[in-house]
Amino acid sequence: MPGKKISVLLVDDSAVVRQVLVAILNETPDIHVMAAASDPIFAMGKLAHEWPDVIVLDVEMPRMDGITFLKKIMSERPTPVVICSSLTQKGAETSLQALSAGAVEIITKPTTGLKNFLIESAAELVAAIRAAANSNVKNLGKRTATPVLTPASKLTADAILPAASGHSMAQTTERIVAIGTSTGGTQALEAVLTALPRVCPGIVIVQHMPEKFTASFAERLNGLSQIEVREARNNDRILPGLALIAPGGKHMMVTRSGAYYHVQVIDGPLVNRHRPSVDVLFRSVARFAGKNATGIIMTGMGDDGARGLKEMLDAGSSTVAQDEASCVVFGMPKEAIKLNAAQRIMPLQEIHQAILHR
């Protein structure tokens, strides 16, 4: 017997977006668009009669903006919400507000060539809706998420950094922490970083997120945290009390120069369909930090970071996976656990302790 279809409500003031998305989604066997509304006021009329499994929501609309509508939804009946946002600075900042309010995913759309983009990105949108439908709703208001990037042939970290044959390095006492996360990661990272004291090991982070979003995200976390948080720049030194977030659209790797660790921010192909990729970061940490590092994999769909965490463990790093109960999507941690890559499985509220104490 076939399973129940995912019921979707579309809310977007663009008639083109509504028309194209309805056509795309209704052609997908496991998805059904229950209604399409031009703004949140119309959407609320639809919700009075039927409630969807997932809401796809624009953020900038007349009469009522998407953020106000989202907060209303999350306070009355928490529901997985996928944000459709333009790749502008204003759009990025507004979308981050949406993530804080409880949205699950960001899908970015251009300001021109919209129809062709939506058709070409159909697989991305479908993946985001499926992830949202399978998300842990009870965690939505507490810790939320990020974008699914454009699908491509699935390259591994070998495309950026070939696997090393050994891990012998000069001695150093500096300790670093590498964190990888995706769907659910924006507020999961907020929960972890805001729990840290000013004095803590240097941290490098890959959060799956488009370009233009990461700078705003880092700035927001910096304002909430005792430690310094910023978007990484090429050749930045990893310092105690500093968290560096990989820029969207770039890979980030850790390197060593004498006793000091630095980051390289580079271009390159999508790895595990992502750029930045957690596997790329974790492999570089395994090679250049080894036993001086801790690797942490948190909420997110897919398997990016699972193999890299195993490489870190094999290189002598301590490793942690977030537990299922506190994840929005138990994908990346689950795959790492399957590979026996995680020494410890911890709830979100305890993960900061793994940063402070190896």
From Swiss-Prot:
Keyword Repeat attributed: no
Major localization listed first in the record, in broad terms: cytoplasm
GO MF annotations, alphabetized: phosphorelay response regulator activity; protein-glutamate methylesterase activity; protein-glutamine glutaminase activity
Record's subcellular location: Cytoplasm
Coiled coil: none
Pfam families (alphabetical): CheB_methylest, Response_reg
Keyword terms: Chemotaxis, Cytoplasm, Hydrolase, Phosphoprotein
Catalytic activity, reaction form: [protein]-L-glutamate 5-O-methyl ester + H2O = L-glutamyl-[protein] + methanol + H(+); L-glutaminyl-[protein] + H2O = L-glutamyl-[protein] + NH4(+)
Free-text note on domains in this protein's UniProt record: Contains a C-terminal catalytic domain, and an N-terminal region which modulates catalytic activity.
Family: Belongs to the CheB family.
Role description: Involved in chemotaxis. Part of a chemotaxis signal transduction system that modulates chemotaxis in response to various stimuli. Catalyzes the demethylation of specific methylglutamate residues introduced into the chemoreceptors (methyl-accepting chemotaxis proteins or MCP) by CheR. Also mediates the irreversible deamidation of specific glutamine residues to glutamic acid.
Name used for this protein in its record: Protein-glutamate methylesterase/protein-glutamine glutaminase 2
Species of origin: Pseudomonas syringae pv. tomato (strain ATCC BAA-871 / DC3000)
Gene name, Swiss-Prot/TrEMBL: cheB2
